[in-house]
């Protein structure tokens, strides 16, 4: 529910909320036997994740997700989180350790300190990881020695998922969804037919707020004038 709340908040504030998924994930439920032995139950559940619009980069020529050829999501991960990716399917453990050995690589964007309302500082002990979902040419996949299923043998391009860190590929797989889709949903507060991103409450209120500000300034100016010294001349 917190992911849905965060998406609804950004939808109203910025005009667009981004949801990623659903994915099937294994969730561990703690359990103990009568002898006190820890025997957790593993259950496959659907999972949705909120993605901030500040970390979401869609195809710039698309007006909606149906038109998007690709999207890129930007992750900010600690060493522990980066190493945790090794427990997920198809991540390259050796390459991840090489990235960790190279040291943190996160470069702050200009807007991040403003959003966080912190003093500006540029030393961030995190890794920047980019996640790509979209079209890839067949020749590129062959060069990376990706095993393609038989149904893609005659395809010129395929949908793929790539994770990058330190300019190294830490995961490259064929899009597992059937039918094939990019697993992101962009929900506009108010649809803008000529842009991928929608219109939020703040942008809708801009003209009204400017008008209210003008009336407030007029009220203050009138109050100042009415408080001026009044001189009466008796002829």
Please provide the spans of the model-predicted regions:
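Extended alpha-helical, oligomerization-prone segments that build pores/tubes and scaffolds
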Residues: 1-235
